[in-house]
Amino acid sequence: MIKDCTRREFLGTLGTAVAGICVSPARLAFASRAPTAPVAVGRCYIYGAEVVQVLSTMFDQLGGLERLVKGKTVAIKINLTGLAANRLRHLPLELTHWTHPQVIGATVHLLGQAGARRIRLLESPMSTAEPLEEFMLQANWEPRDFMSAAPVVEFENTNYLGRAKKYSRLWVPDGGLMFRAYDLNHSYEDCDVFVSLAKLKEHATAGVTLSMKNCFGITPCTIYGEEAGRDEPSLVPRGGRGMFHHGERQPSKSALSEIDLRSPRDPGYRVPRVVADLVAARPVHLAVIDGVETMMGGEGPWTSGRRHVKSGLLIAGTNCVTTDAVAMALMGFDPIADRGKPPFETCDSTLRLAEDLGVGSRDLRQIEVVGTPIAQAKFNARSA
């Protein structure tokens, strides 16, 4: 039975970027019309009770959670990329490339306090249809800590059909860049509020992985994986999403195929467009980025040049593009940068593509930053 939990009780139990581009006046005019929203930045140096306190202040600075979640079902996509056995120098996964359980639990707790009716923790664990809770246990996490953080907390592995009888088809407004629609686990449709709870990292293919790239993982490998079924989705997910990276095959025939089969097969072209499509089709209402401790040089221990970094940051906003723009600036990158410039040396900018789709603005001049100023918290991701 799931019990109610006071703030004090929760704190006690959880404990534990083609060289240079010319931007046309027309492009700038469109960008200036893209939606914008404030972004909160908070300093947090350790994963303790401070996480709840800092996040609570940040959410208040954004206007409070109650107006967003009271009486509603909230879905939270967390970032548990790779396998539980993938570690950087034997460090716990949550100190490098996974969203930290303290940040997950604190967010769940504050959403519950704000009156969320139901909270679902979602992720698509690699190559398995086992319950998400079991995947967490492999990393020595305790799912019951999350269950005690709010009155009703559920878990779902979204890498396959899950508990529903059919997949949900989410359409990209105005037609999409790579696909017109994506077939997803029901949990991404059966919610009133969608939260992307990400990690502050660079990415070998997409330049950075923040609140938008985190949504790449909402796609089920039973349809979009290398070993997905040809006609119908496979029953169990196997392998990764190489289809999105290289385009060597199409999704299961039950889903829609690519818009243009003659488009480039370059992962640096394809992946950013898929991500931009996804955040347009499944809008993010709240973006939270864990940068207290993380890794740079890539998205996981399997990339080269990776290193553990203590950046001491939490970032949150109600628009995923504006939030990622501020996060990029905090990492020492220019959010207006595109292919050929750091961190997008070999890829197109997901931020620019999402901005072009009208999701949000990446122009810092249009974004109000509340809490800690960028200048006071900025670090160099390439030398940290």
Language model region names:
Residues 30-384:
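Extended, low-polarity segments enriched in aliphatic/aromatic residues
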